[in-house]
């Protein structure tokens, strides 16, 4: 069960996870590399964390059968991670497939997310 609520506003996602308000911004740096900016606010303190995520075409096909765009997969991956660990525990740079080494349920969660959001 998801503990996050998500509201998309102008290409940014506003999240509430475990009582913390967060703004998630995904920036495509190249066809395979994405910047992720997480602005979090808890008890009137604001913090910004910046990440680099690599998603190859092969990764996208393996995880999603190319049914979603890379930026949407990165967005889902960060929501998934933030539901499970504090922002400070997320590696600053990683390939998206490494998530399943720490969270074996990630590929299945991706498939469930795609199936729930299929048109």
Q: Which stretches of residues belong to each language-model region?
A:
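N-terminal intrinsically disordered, cationic/polar leader segments
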Residues: 19-63, 95-117
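Ser/Thr/Pro-rich, acidic low-complexity intrinsically disordered regulatory segments
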Residues: 87, 116-119
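Acidic, aromatic-enriched beta-alpha/helix-loop junctions
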Residues: 52-87
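Generic alpha-helix structural propensity
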Residues: 68-76, 94, 101, 105
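N-terminal, charged amphipathic alpha-helical interaction modules
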Residues: 86-98
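Short, Lys/Arg-enriched N-terminal segments with co-localized hydrophobic residues
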Residues: 7-21
């Amino acid at each position: 069960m998801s503990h996050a609520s998500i509201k998309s506003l102008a290409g940014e996602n506003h999240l509430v996870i475990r009582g913390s308000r967060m703004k998630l911004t995904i920036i495509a740096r190249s066809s395979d590399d994405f910047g992720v900016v997480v602005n979090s606010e808890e008890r009137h303190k604001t913090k910004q964390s910046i990440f680099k995520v690599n998603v190859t075409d092969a990764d996208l096909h393996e995880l999603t059968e190319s049914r979603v765009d890379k930026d949407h997969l990165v967005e889902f991956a960060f929501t998934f991670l933030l539901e499970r660990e504090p922002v400070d525990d997320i590696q600053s740079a990683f390939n998206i497939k490494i998530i399943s080494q720490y969270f074996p349920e990630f590929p299945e969660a991706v498939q469930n997310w795609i199936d729930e959001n299929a048109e």
